[in-house]
Amino acid sequence: MIDVAIIDSGINMTDTDICSMVSKGFSIDYSDGNTVYQNEYNDLNGHGTYCASIIRRFCPDVKLTIIKILDQCKMGRSECLIEALHYLYHNPVDVISMSLSTQDNQYEKELGIICKKIEESGMIMVSSLANHAEISYPAVYEGVIGVKGALFLEEKEYIYHPDRVIQCQGSSIPVLVEGVDGTYTFFGGNSKAAANISGIIASLLQKFGMTDDFGALFKEYSCHTKKNEQTLTISSIINSNVTISGELCEEKDFKKLITIMQNVLEIPMRKSQLIFECSILHPELNIDKKNFGKLIKEIEREWKIHFRKEEVNLLSIRDITTIYSLLKRTEKYESNQK
C-alpha cells in the first residue's frame, strides 16, 4: 500500500472514511524557540481534509501519515515544516504532499538542504506554488515537483516539464468537498492542483511501483493530456450561454430545481432570468462557494440522493442545465445500485 504524508492542517477526526486510512498522525508546534510534537491532528480549518479527500479520489487504498503544522487560519512556521521534513527523512514514506508554501527566504537554505536529502533518499515530494506568485518554497527546489493550477477538461489530466522551475500543472478547477462542519464548499487553486498531482503519483506508484526512472513514467502519462487553452478559460465558463428547450422548462423536477436555486441562492426576481441565459457563476448573481455548497446540499436533501463529489466541479455544474443533468444522472446511478 502506498504511504502518502500530508503536511497541512491535519484532518477532520469525525470523518471516519479518511481516518480509517491514517497510519499515524501528530502535530508539530513552535514554542519558546523549539518545535514541539503533540498527539493531536484534528483539522480546525478543513484544508488538510480537502487535500486528503482529493488524494483518496485518485488512490482509494492509500495509507496516510498526517503531520499538522497549520492552524485554524492556515498559518504555520517554517521551523515546523523543516522539522516535519526531518521526521519524514528518518521515517520514510512514498510521497510527501505539501499544499502549502512560504515566500520568506529566511529559512531557504535550511529548507533546501533537507529537501535535497529527501530527494536523494528516493521519496517523491510535491508542493504547491503560492497562488499568484512566481516563486515560493519548497516548490522551486530542484528535487521537489512544484505545482501550479491550470484549467483542464478532466481532473486526471496534467502537464509535466521536469526542466522547468515549477515542473507541473494540475487541475485547479474547484471541486465539491465537505467542510469540517459538515457543510459543502468548493476547493480549488494551486493547493487543490498539488493534491491532484499527489494522488496521481500515488496511483501510478500503486500500479507500477517505484521504477528506476519514475520521472520518465510520470512524463509519459502527462502526454495523454489534451489541454485546450484556447476554449477552456474562466471567462468562457462564466459567460457561457444556456440553451433550454421548452420541453425541459415544463419538466416538474426542472421547475422544482429553479425554485430551489432562487431560494437558496437568494436570487432577486429582477435577476432570475440570468439563470436561463448564462452561467450561474455570472458576477451579477453574486454566487460564492459557500452558498453554492448550500445549493448542492439542498438538492441532495430534496431528492434524497448523494452526489459523488468527484463528479461535481465548476465545469459539471456551470449552469442550470448541467446541474439538472447531474441530478438525473445521480438518480439513475443510485437507482441501479439498489
For each of these PLM feature ranges, what is it?
Residues 1, 76-97, 108-121, 132-146, ...:
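Mature extracellular/periplasmic domains of secretome proteins
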Residues 1-58, 62:
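Active-site core segment of subtilase-fold serine proteases
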Residues 2, 8, 17, 134-206:
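Extracellular S/T/G-rich loop segment that most often corresponds to the catalytic His/Ser-adjacent loop
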Residues 37-103:
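Subtilisin-like peptidase catalytic core
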Residues 65, 124-126:
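Structural detector of well-ordered beta-strand residues that form the stable sheet scaffold
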Residues 97-101, 128, 149, 195:
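A cross-family glycoside hydrolase active-site/sugar-binding cleft signature
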Residues 209-231:
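An often Trp-containing, charged/polar helix-loop segment at the C-terminal end
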Residues 223-338:
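Phosphopantetheine-dependent thiolation modules in NRPS/PKS and related acyl-activating systems
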